[in-house]
Amino acid sequence: MDTQSSAKLAEMTYEIGKTKVKKRIPNAIDNVNEHLENEGINYEVVPEWTDRNISTFRNKDDPSKIHISHKGTQFGSSTGSKDVISDLKIALGLGNYDTHVRRRKKRTERIINALNPDELTMSGHSLGGMSLNHTIGKSKKVREKLLQADTFNAGSSFAFNNDLKLSERAKKELKEIPITHHRTRNDIVSKGL
């Protein structure tokens, strides 16, 4: 998947994430699908595996191609307070121990179990980039399926150690997967990277 499409799918998670009332998620999904079609991105939302934290997309021509995107911090959303608490933990170097981040990992694994993609790509912005990194680093199930991942200004702490404690096997597996960390110069959230 090209970087622009990956970034657009990460951006679209915010459209779904901003819904404060759960029953309005289908309207947000319709808006996202329309936007993706207008942008010429051949993916659509998988409603049953999309919530306010993680959006799942499938290729319209080949449903075995799946893209999972983790949402970043979104003030004013129903997840906003959890997002901010996670951000504070990231700033203190404790992001990998955050419940919100760990739940995203478990949900991602459930999505993979349910959809069993032939091709899996992933993306995330800010907090979503950090939770994506955690998920990839800590989940063998994800690494076994993952073809590519892009993070955009992934959350990190410039004051504390951000390293994931990875097994030697995980480190070896990660060398085989193209994971690109895109960072905007002077972005304070990702400064630790």
Where does each model-flagged region fall?
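A conserved cap/lid and substrate-binding interface adjacent to the catalytic center
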Residues: 13, 18-122, 140-148, 155-159, ...
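Catalytic metal-binding/acid-base residues of hydrolase active sites
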Residues: 127, 153-155
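Extracytoplasmic/secreted cell-surface and envelope-processing proteins
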Residues: 131-132, 158-161, 191
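Short glycine-enriched nucleophile-adjacent loop
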Residues: 132-140
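Alpha/beta-hydrolase-fold catalytic nucleophile elbow
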Residues: 152-153, 183
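A catalytic-pocket lid/entrance helix-loop region that shapes and gates access to the active site
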Residues: 168-178
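Acidic catalytic loop of the alpha/beta-hydrolase fold
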Residues: 184-192
